[in-house]
């Protein structure tokens, strides 16, 4: 007699928040054979209805407590608004769930440091979606720099200005644009420098007389002497007839330079080193959430 049995080795996950980012994660996990999306939770009835249509094999719930209390759920994906994230991370740790979180990890800097302390004092795995480290263009540029092609790394300049969300269009819980989108560039600049920030100065503009700065420029130094400047804002011509944006990375060494620009569809990398001059033009690649999910599964 032949006896066959199959064991589901996929990672069981509950998605909390089925808005734009939650759906990105659902799509990436659905395309992978490594994830079992057991639950989808959202407090909005329309989002739950959409989840039922898109994911008939998942349990669709309004109360996330059901996900946390299910001992078979190994991972929670926290993709709601920032003001609820700290409480959800705290609950995930209490119930022994690994964590994939959107940024920012809380609604204020004080709460963010509390979350950092909580996650560092547990043996659970937690990650935040700072996807630029997984992008092909940044990895290409960093590899070129490590080959010594531009000499000693000296200056890192990053700019990302888009029309983006104006105040009142859904960004209030995440705080000023720099507190959310800007963290990508704070992170990737530090990644290039390879050490912690030492000094910084910043200025902001309260566009449209809004209470928070919607444009910020920050510059300073790293502990190894590398200098940086970061410019970020959702202020770039919201009412233009034909909207545009300005996004670039410009890294200067003692002997050469590397730079990148993109239009959200195509990224162009120019590498000007002592031995090679290379130009690479490829699809931008989006948010690389599939890469994040695979790396998390590997962990």
Task: Show where each model-derived region lies.
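N-terminal Rossmann-like dinucleotide-binding module
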Residues: 1-55
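C-terminal helix-rich "cap/oligomerization" subdomain common to oxidoreductases
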Residues: 1-10, 75-80, 223, 295-299
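Beta-loop-alpha module in the N-terminal Rossmann-like domain of NAD(P)-dependent dehydrogenases
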Residues: 25, 55-118
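A contiguous active-site-proximal alpha/beta segment in oxidoreductase catalytic domains
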Residues: 83, 106-167
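Hydrophobic residues in well-ordered beta-strands that form the structural core
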Residues: 101, 126-128, 157, 230, ...
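Mid-domain beta-loop-alpha active-site segment that forms a flexible
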Residues: 129-137, 160, 164-201, 209-215, ...
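Contiguous beta-strand/loop segments that form the cofactor/metal-binding neighborhood of enzyme cores
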Residues: 186-266, 290-299
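C-terminal helical cap and adjacent loop that interface with cofactors, partners, or active-site loops
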Residues: 275-299
């Amino acid at each position: 007699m032949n006896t066959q049995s199959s064991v589901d080795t996929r990672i069981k996950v509950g998605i909390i928040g089925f808005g734009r980012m939650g759906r990105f994660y659902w799509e990436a996990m659905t395309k992978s054979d490594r994830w079992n999306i057991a639950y989808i939770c959202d407090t909005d009835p329309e989002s739950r209805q959409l989840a039922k249509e898109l994911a008939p094999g998942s349990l669709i719930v309004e109360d996330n407590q059901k996900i946390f209390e299910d001992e078979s759920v190994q991972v929670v994906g926290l993709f709601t608004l920032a003001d609820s994230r700290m409480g959800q991370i705290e609950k995930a740790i209490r119930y022994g769930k690994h964590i994939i979180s959107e940024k920012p990890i809380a609604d204020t800097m004080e709460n963010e440091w509390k979350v950092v302390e909580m996650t560092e004092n547990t043996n659970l795995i937690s990650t935040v979606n700072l996807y630029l480290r997984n992008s092909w263009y940044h990895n290409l540029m960093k590899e070129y720099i490590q080959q010594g092609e531009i000499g000693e790394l000296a200056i890192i300049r990053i700019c990302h200005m888009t029309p983006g969300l104006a105040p009142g269009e859904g960004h209030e819980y995440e705080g000023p644009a720099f507190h959310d989108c800007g963290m990508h560039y704070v992170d990737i600049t530090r990644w290039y420098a390879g050490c912690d920030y030492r000094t910084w100065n910043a200025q902001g503009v309260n566009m449209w007389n809004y209470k928070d700065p919607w444009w910020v420029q920050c510059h300073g130094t790293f502990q190894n002497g590398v200098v940086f400047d970061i410019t970020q804002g959702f202020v770039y011509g919201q009412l233009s007839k034909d909207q545009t944006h300005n996004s670039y990375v410009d890294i200067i060494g003692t002997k050469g330079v590397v730079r990148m620009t993109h239009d959200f569809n195509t990224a162009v990398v120019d590498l000007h080193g002592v031995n090679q001059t290379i130009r690479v033009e490829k699809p931008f690649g989006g948010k690389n959430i599939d890469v994040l999910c695979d790396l998390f599964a590997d962990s």
